[in-house]
């Protein structure tokens, strides 16, 4: 009798302690709400980590620039002119004209990529020759994390539309290591002789940056943006382009191939501030007659703006509200209009 009563009491306690279906649904709903509240915070924390890693990349690139400057007494050229077999005196007209090694290739020995620089032997090999050499080309196609922004998840493993031809005019392939960081070329459109730190055969010294190294941009971000089915006109040589137009981020090693005689061609490693440009502008490409999307910097997938390396090697974040005029003044190294105050 006593045992039977005790079992009934325990049974009632067990039934009372169990969840009802309604209670279970309430618990699930509460968990869902908590996840919904926490997820944005988790995503924001992850993006903060990616932005920090991106900033560290830019600082290391800035250190590479200054190590080069300490060794050579000048900053590396935006890109080095290469004369083709039938070029005229300017090194750009005629078959075989090429854009040679770009700024990124010159600082490799002063970063963690010294072995890549040794493989390429840039002092004795042109960029076109390296691309046609199996061993050197393989080195140029390896992913280089120090040149990539972790927030740009849209980028491919390598550039596929550089169309860099060798001296014989034969396409030498694709897949070259891309870079999310481009060098400041001009306060207007991209140009062979821009007013920024990096242009064709540039030899900018610290003393040339009269606006101040803390008030001059050296490098900035540029995301990969792929717009398919766009038809436009190359403003440099009036060749009509159609199909997949890709204003990609940049290339670690070189500027574009035989079209580098126009400002349209040197966009692969250099950035500028043409009319209509600005931080994360334009958000879409209309046509190459606009020319802005292919050349504008800076752009990123960091919420609210993009990061730049200043000429003194420091890194700073620029918001999307930063005006085009301010960005242009920050790119020009000696326009006599140094930007002051909070920008």
Where do the PLM segments sit?
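N-terminal non-cleavable signal-anchor helices
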Residues: 10, 28, 253-256
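Surface-exposed loop/linker segments characteristic of extracytoplasmic
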Residues: 48-343
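N-terminal single-pass transmembrane signal-anchor helix
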Residues: 16-50, 60
